[in-house]
Design a protein with these regions (language model features):
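Walker A (P-loop) phosphate-binding loop of ABC-type ATPase nucleotide-binding domains
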Residues: 4-8
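Helix-to-loop junction immediately C-terminal to a conserved catalytic motif
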Residues: 17
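ABC ATPase NBD Q-loop/coupling interface
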Residues: 28-44, 110
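ABC-family P-loop ATPase nucleotide-binding domains
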Residues: 57-132
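Walker B catalytic motif
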Residues: 138-139, 146
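Helical segment within the ABC ATPase nucleotide-binding domain
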Residues: 148-161
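Conserved H-loop
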Residues: 162-170
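Conserved beta-strand-loop-alpha-helix hinge in the C-terminal portion
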Residues: 177, 182, 186, 190-213
Length: 214
């Protein structure tokens, strides 16, 4: 999804994820044919939805390792415990792929992290949680080229026919590294144009003004 500022793209992602700031008063949010509009955030997460924010929240006092372990534990049947050895082995392997220092595991979630570190951390969470639907809300905002490549690498490593991505961005730059199957342009809360990857290039060349005559 590509959109100018104020078009409703972040509202869309937060409504899908069940953010507390929004209440659905009309319409439905269908996930695999089931309306999830009344589900709580944690229920939507267990249903397979992951939302990466433009500005990831800090969680002082909770280490990255404990945060991830608790999130994975919450998805298991009652009475079943995570294998700690397997968990750390998997987490360290994923961190190595994302070029993350292993010291991050003991640091509080996003506290004192740079913008690029926060985005790497979110991609680590996404890979570890292995969701069926990933919502990336302007996750490329403010990233340098190295961090952008790491984010793209994480996304591309998860691409499959059984997983969906909704990538929300203003810019073509991210799509130089993540090739979309479909591009939808939003304006004033509605999808006003849809196409393939070539639509993103058209937007890059002409800007959003071309929509007024499209």
């Amino acid at each position: 999804s590509m959109c100018p500022s104020g078009s409703g793209k972040s509202t869309l992602s937060k409504i899908i994820a069940g953010h507390d700031d929004y209440e659905v008063t009309e319409g439905r949010v269908l996930l695999d044919g089931v309306d999830i509009a009344e589900l709580e955030v944690d229920e939507r997460s267990r249903a397979g939805i992951f939302l990466a924010f433009q500005y990831p929240a800090e969680v002082p006092g909770v280490s990255n390792a404990n945060f991830l372990r608790a999130a994975l534990q919450a998805r298991l049947p009652e009475g079943e415990e995570i294998d700690a050895v397997a968990f750390y082995k998997d987490m360290y392997a994923k961190m190595d792929e994302l070029e993350m220092n292993r010291k991050f595991t003991s640091r509080s979630v996003n506290e004192g992290f740079s913008g690029g570190e926060k985005k790497r951390n979110e991609i680590l969470q996404m890979i570890m949680l292995d969701p069926r639907y990933c919502l990336l809300d302007e996750t490329d905002s403010g990233l340098d080229i190295d961090a952008l490549k790491v984010v793209a690498k994480g996304v591309n490593s998860m691409r499959s026919d059984s997983r969906g991505f909704l990538v929300i961005t203003h810019y073509q730059r991210l799509l130089d590294y993540i090739k979309p199957d479909h591009v939808h342009v939003m304006a004033d809360g509605q999808i006003v144009k849809s196409g393939g990857a070539e639509l993103a290039l058209e937007l890059e060349e002409s800007g959003y003004d071309f929509l007024k005559t499209a």
